[in-house]
């Protein structure tokens, strides 16, 4: 008997109350454990239904009201395919709730180059596959030339001139921009695009070369190109960017923090240890199976999330009795509104969850619900949430970050 026939038979039996409804509802169907709901009888995407149980039968009873979508899968993004690799984005047109941040995945083959360019916004990056040669120049003629590997990051301030080159067979990077409307005209400026739209006699005068030098300039402009790995170094100008001025950050400078609550680790990279990163702050979070980022909120900005591996569930409380639960998997992005309350839980029994928290801010900051209750007079806190004082008195006063 085919799976669909078995499912139909099982659902019919459930409808007749001949067998109990599974805990958490019927997988892939809008049927809750309580008996609420019914089967899908029309068109539906079964794979998406199975990946998002919190939208159907698995939604908690505590969810309430109309809460906008806060999730986007990069698999739904249009992929721009080029000879040097590919690019796919999440911008505000994809996820209208993401005002502060836009994201992109960029893949470069060995020798592939992300063309020389600059932006009207800042660009931050996290490398999760391969390695890259990073090149940048400031308005003062200082330069950066650095090789970055998995876990390393960079930050280019608004207007900084830069380029990337892939150094291994396959290289992939997450780019973050501090404006959700990243595709707006006047955001990205490509050097080859500019040159191809400048009269050749002007170019000749500017660079002191014959006009024919620019006969083969790329037109239309290519964001990625094939090339060979650079063997050149850079000298002169006003010297290299180093120390607190460096645009690059090696993750070895941010050891994993074994948090008090157990259940995982956090690595924080913000302006405290990466001084140039003034508008993007990051936490790399690893949750063990069953681990949970404790109930908290962020006082400084929206939280933009990138899920690198594993599976997660999060409930977002946006005030006024409104709350919604979302399911996340590898390749998903999410955004939680400024100051909204939430948690993130690893729903796997065997696999570690790895995700990035990103903020349009100079530092990572959160307020722990548990710590707030514990550091409030216990009788007041107990009255506020209608629990015995003993419950408040046993809550740890130290921020736990992650619990298991």
From Swiss-Prot:
GO terms for cellular component: extracellular region. This is Probable oxalate decarboxylase ARB_04859. Mn(2+) 2 binds at residues 296, 298, 303, 342. PANTHER family: OXALATE-BINDING PROTEIN, SLL1358 PROTEIN. NCBIfam families: bicupin_oxalic. One of its GO terms (molecular function) is metal ion binding. The active site is at residue 357. Residues 74-215, 249-393 form the Cupin type-1 domain. Its cofactor is Mn(2+). Glycans are attached at residues 226, 244, 346. One of its GO terms (biological process) is oxalate metabolic process. Keywords: Decarboxylase, Glycoprotein, Lyase, Manganese, Metal-binding, Secreted, Signal. It is found in: Secreted. Mn(2+) 1 binds at residues 117, 119, 123, 162. InterPro entries: Bicupin_oxalate_deCO2ase/Oxase, Cupin_1, GPI/OXD, RmlC-like_jellyroll, RmlC_Cupin_sf. CDD domains: cupin_OxDC_C. It catalyses: oxalate + H(+) = formate + CO2. The keyword Signal applies. Residues 1-17 form the signal peptide. Its main location: secreted. The keyword Manganese applies. Converts oxalate to formate and CO(2) in an O(2)-dependent reaction. Can also catalyze minor side reactions: oxalate oxidation to produce H(2)O(2), and oxalate-dependent, H(2)O(2)-independent dye oxidations. Induction: Expression is up-regulated in presence of human keratinocytes. Its EC number is 4.1.1.2. Binds 2 manganese ions per subunit.
